[in-house]
């Protein structure tokens, strides 16, 4: 019990916290479910997220890893964010198959554990990487020279390592909760009535540490950037590049938080507070199902962050795309002049 409560982040979002209809007795409650909704909704949404997330983040990783003349700490954070998204999207086909079969897992116990583990590792690592990105971008506009050493490539990798270790270590409890056999059906990703009370307490900690604090930090960064822009005399050509990138980074991060993470954390909390073994709340179950899909969709929105706010990402992208094109033949000045004369009509 104490070991589980010490796991602050994804461990609080156990697989049992996913929207489910398994209420008490399995036989009597199969009729009071959102099974049909999940069977129709999840496979389509997860398949779209898988295709776009795998292509977008896979190609982004390729662009980030291509040799380039200049690399920054921002690129390091974005690369780790893309890796987290790609690792998560790889597990989505298993979720698609599970819901297409009417919430029946056929791949065994291990994939069931990994599905829950990857979902929440991705969610909270994304939250922390987005928050760190916004803070670094904000501080770069306020103390650009003082933070030159602090935001070095080496320190960026160290910070990413700390985030990975913290999130993955606190999520290990998810690997202890696998599939469950009931009435010739192998259940996975289901809410267990025996653990609701404990999950309520754990959810509150996750809500504060995993969402409220990062979201509050993002909001403060946004307000302080606006304040800094109002104080600084903006040249006629427009915003200074560092200010513009900082503002774009925080705005996109806030949009992802508001669209993907806020609805899920609010409805997940409400779902646990309202959950009772003898009552069926189809509307709430469906709402939580939709917000869970939105949380998973964060991996589709992050590539837009790389493109619009990434450090040299557009230049890296152009360089990567030019590699496959045939190079123009170069010639000496005298030869080119001769060719021009000979081909003149």
UniProtKB/Swiss-Prot annotation:
CDD domains: 7tmA_CysLTR2 (cd15157). Pfam families: 7tm_1. The chain crosses the membrane at residues 44-64, 74-94, 125-145, 155-175, 206-226, 247-267, 288-308. Residues 1-43, 95-124, 176-205, 268-287 are extracellular. It is found in: Cell membrane. Keywords: Cell membrane, Disulfide bond, G-protein coupled receptor, Glycoprotein, Membrane, Receptor, Transducer, Transmembrane, Transmembrane helix. It is a multi-pass membrane protein. One of its GO terms (biological process) is neuropeptide signaling pathway. The keyword Membrane applies. Glycans are attached at residues 20, 29, 177, 184. GO terms for molecular function: cysteinyl leukotriene receptor activity; G protein-coupled peptide receptor activity. Residues 65-73, 146-154, 227-246, 309-345 are cytoplasmic. InterPro entries: CLT2_recept, Cyst_leuk_rcpt, GPCR_Rhodpsn, GPCR_Rhodpsn_7TM. GO terms for cellular component: plasma membrane. Disulfide bonds join 112-188. The keyword Endoplasmic reticulum does not apply. It comes from the Eukaryota. Receptor for cysteinyl leukotrienes. The response is mediated via a G-protein that activates a phosphatidylinositol-calcium second messenger system. PANTHER family: G-PROTEIN COUPLED RECEPTORS FAMILY 1 PROFILE DOMAIN-CONTAINING PROTEIN, PURINOCEPTOR-RELATED G-PROTEIN COUPLED RECEPTOR. Belongs to the G-protein coupled receptor 1 family. This is Cysteinyl leukotriene receptor 2. It comes from Sus scrofa. The gene is CYSLTR2.
């Amino acid at each position: 019990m104490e070991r589980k409560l010490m796991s602050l982040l994804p461990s609080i979002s156990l697989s049992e916290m996913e929207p489910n209809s398994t209420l008490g007795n399995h036989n009597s409650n199969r009729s009071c479910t959102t099974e049909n909704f999940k069977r129709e909704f999840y496979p389509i949404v997860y398949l779209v997220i898988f295709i776009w997330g795998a292509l977008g983040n896979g190609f982004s990783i390729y662009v980030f890893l291509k040799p380039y003349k200049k690399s920054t700490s921002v690129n390091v954070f974005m690369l780790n964010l893309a890796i987290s998204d790609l690792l998560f999207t790889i597990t989505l086909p298993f979720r698609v198959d599970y819901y297409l079969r009417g919430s029946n897992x056929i791949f065994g116990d291990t994939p069931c554990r990994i599905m829950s583990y990857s979902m929440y590792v991705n969610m909270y690592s994304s939250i922390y990487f987005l928050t760190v990105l916004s803070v670094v971008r904000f501080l770069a506009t306020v103390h650009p020279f003082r933070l030159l050493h602090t935001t070095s490539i080496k320190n960026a990798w160290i910070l990413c390592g700390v985030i990975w270790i913290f999130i993955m270590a606190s999520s290990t409890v998810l690997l202890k909760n696998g599939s469950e056999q009931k009435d010739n059906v192998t259940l996975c990703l289901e809410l267990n009535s025996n653990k609701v009370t404990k999950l309520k307490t754990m959810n509150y900690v996750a809500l504060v540490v995993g969402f409220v604090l990062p979201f509050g930090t993002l909001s403060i960064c946004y307000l302080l950037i606006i304040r800094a822009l109002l104080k600084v005399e903006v040249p006629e050509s427009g915003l200074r590049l560092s200010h513009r990138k900082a503002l774009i980074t925080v705005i996109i991060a806030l949009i992802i938080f508001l669209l993907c993470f806020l609805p899920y954390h609010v409805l997940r909390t409400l779902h646990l507070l309202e959950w009772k073994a003898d009552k069926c709340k189809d509307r709430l179950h469906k709402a939580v199902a939709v917000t869970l899909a939105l949380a998973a969709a964060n991996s589709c929105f992050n590539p837009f962050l790389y493109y619009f706010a990434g450090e040299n990402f557009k230049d890296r992208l152009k360089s990567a795309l030019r590699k496959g094109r045939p190079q123009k033949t170069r010639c000496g000045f005298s030869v080119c002049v001769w060719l021009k004369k000979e081909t003149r009509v």
